[in-house]
Amino acid sequence: MKTNKNIIVEGKHNKPILTDVFYLENKQPKPIVIFCHGYKGFKDWGAWNLMAETFAKAGFFFIKFNFSHNGGTIEEPIDFPDLEAFGNNNYSKELDDLGNVIDWISTNIDYQKEINLDD
């Protein structure tokens, strides 16, 4: 299984979106699952890596990410050092972040042979 962690996706609101991908590297197009964890958590919380690995082993291209205003930073992605960003977070920003992740994977040349954008 191929895992790329802490990929920085540029966000619309001047905050990076820290992203992980999990997949079986075999140059076969796979359906994409984008996991939006919610409840102001982190992409690395609890069993999320185990869940990502399970989806990847089942033949999916699995993406999980931290919302840009979840309170974490690139240097400290599993803590709350950026309380101002956390306080300014809202549903619209999270929808924008999801759109940025969709745009990023849809145009990322590195993964084009591994993802299915047609279905």
Predicted regions and their residues:
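Generic detector of contiguous secondary-structure segments
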Residues: 3-5, 9, 13, 43-62, ...
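Short, surface-exposed "cap/lid" segments of acyl-processing enzymes
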Residues: 25-76, 80
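Alpha/beta-hydrolase active-site loop
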Residues: 84-118
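N-terminal cap/lid segment of alpha/beta-hydrolase-fold proteins
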Residues: 1-28
